[in-house]
Amino acid sequence: MAAKVEPFWIRKTLEHLDQEEWESLCDGCGLCCLQKLEDEDDNSVYYTRIACKLLDLKTCQCTDYPNRRASVPDCIQLTPGQADQFKWLPPTCGYRLVSERNDLPLWHHLVCGDRDAVHHERISQSGRMLSEGSVPEDDWEDYLIFRAG
């Protein structure tokens, strides 16, 4: 009988993933591409419903992923070396889960094989976001959806 092989996200730490494995951890929820506000009093970070100008509001995918940092200089590029800072990511995020040595949820495409499951389970923000160009930045506070961490 063949030994059961654990999935790469269980077997490996983030630092040992190859580029394809790293990119595949993204579940496509779009949450990391929402604009965030920081409370000046306690440094808490809050997610808004306001999406980055490059985010497709339906698919929750970046419309110019390879060049995103040229268009959006403050775009956050996640790397394995930042794992200790992933607490701001949603608790469902594959990067955060693997960095905390947890398994991926059943709806994650690497588990279920369906990239649309994140939308069907309403984990993603598909259909619930606004484009950053449609809301004045001074009004973003009116669109808070949850606190990070």
From Swiss-Prot:
Entry-linked InterPro entries: Puta_zinc/iron-chelating_dom (IPR005358), UCP006173 (IPR008228)
Disulphide connectivity of cysteines: none
Annotated Pfam families: CxxCxxCC
Family, per entry: Belongs to the UPF0260 family.
Protein name: UPF0260 protein PFLU_1520
Source organism of the structure: Pseudomonas fluorescens (strain SBW25)
Origin organism lineage: Bacteria, Pseudomonadati, Pseudomonadota, Gammaproteobacteria, Pseudomonadales
